[in-house]
């Protein structure tokens, strides 16, 4: 599975209009990744922006309602599902059914429509905040790690620096942007590809004819090159196209783990 957006228009309609139709493994993974990354961006936007400015938002005093995958609490599962669906973009961001949520460890803030889930493989998903609470990044990410969360994914941008700050430094996969399957409601905010707090390519290097160039020097290189991005992750990109792609708000999707 390498193209995140493949068949997006087709399978998003299948999800909404024909839920009984089983999606292929490829489509299912792509739809899941898109839903989770956009939801996390909504949740952690304020925290990430504060971090860019050298600040950190204070964490609110919260308690969780919990449901354990090994012994699901039906009432918590129902409330979590309602919480997940309570946002203005819920029809687009919500991916999981109640039966799927039952198989995860759920953490829902008491009295608020905000929480997160952890799958059996350690994937942190369904991060959402449809409440007035702010400053949840520190609590959510720390609590997720303390309860078995080991990996997550996101669109490159302001979340890169935030997730790195909380220990998700191992970049193990990248899905490059595909304009044909750009997600609905995307805001196309420009991403600074040369800022390490907003891009995995900021300190990327490429060896061309035995000379090592940094990403800034590669800006005009209009050819496919293998570069070493954050954490030494190797990926083939066209640097010139990638600069323009990020400039016009079309970042890649990054998969991280502890």
Language-model segment annotations:
Residues 112, 119-197, 205-226:
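Acyl-donor binding region in acyl/amide transferases
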Residues 1-16:
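Short acidic, low-complexity intrinsically disordered linear motifs used
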Residues 20-22:
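Acidic, proline-/serine-/threonine-rich low-complexity intrinsically disordered repeat tracts
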Residues 24-146, 238, 243-246, 250-253:
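Glycine-rich short-loop/terminal segments
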Residues 10, 32-35, 203:
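A detector of low-complexity, intrinsically disordered, Ser/Thr/Gly/Pro/Ala-rich segments
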Residues 203, 214, 221-258:
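Intrinsically disordered, low-complexity, charge-dense segments enriched in Lys/Arg
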């Amino acid at each position: 599975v390498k193209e995140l957006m493949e068949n997006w228009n087709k399978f998003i309609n299948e999800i909404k209009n024909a839920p009984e139709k089983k999606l292929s493994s490829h489509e299912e993974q792509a739809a899941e990744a898109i839903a989770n990354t956009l939801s996390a961006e909504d949740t952690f936007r304020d925290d990430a922006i504060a971090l860019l400015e050298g600040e950190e938002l204070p964490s609110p005093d919260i308690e969780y309602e919990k449901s354990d995958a090994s012994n699901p609490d039906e009432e918590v599962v129902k409330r979590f599902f309602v919480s997940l669906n309570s946002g203005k973009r819920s029809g687009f961001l919500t991916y999981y059914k109640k039966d799927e949520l039952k198989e995860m460890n759920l953490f829902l803030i008491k009295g608020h429509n905000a929480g997160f889930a952890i799958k059996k493989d350690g994937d942190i998903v369904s991060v959402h905040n449809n409440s007035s609470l702010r400053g949840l990044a520190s609590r959510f990410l720390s609590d997720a790690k303390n309860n078995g969360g080991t990996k997550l994914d996101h669109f490159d941008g302001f979340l890169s620096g935030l997730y790195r700050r909380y220990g998700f430094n191992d970049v193990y996969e990248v899905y490059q942007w595909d304009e044909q399957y750009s997600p609905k409601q995307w805001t196309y905010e420009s991403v600074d590809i040369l800022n390490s707090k907003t891009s995995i390519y900021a300190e990327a290097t490429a060896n061309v004819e035995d000379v090592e160039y940094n990403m800034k020097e590669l800006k005009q290189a209009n050819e496919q090159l293998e570069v070493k991005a954050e954490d030494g992750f190797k990926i083939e990109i066209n640097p010139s196209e990638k600069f323009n792609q990020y400039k016009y708000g079309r970042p890649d999707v990054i998969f991280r783990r502890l």
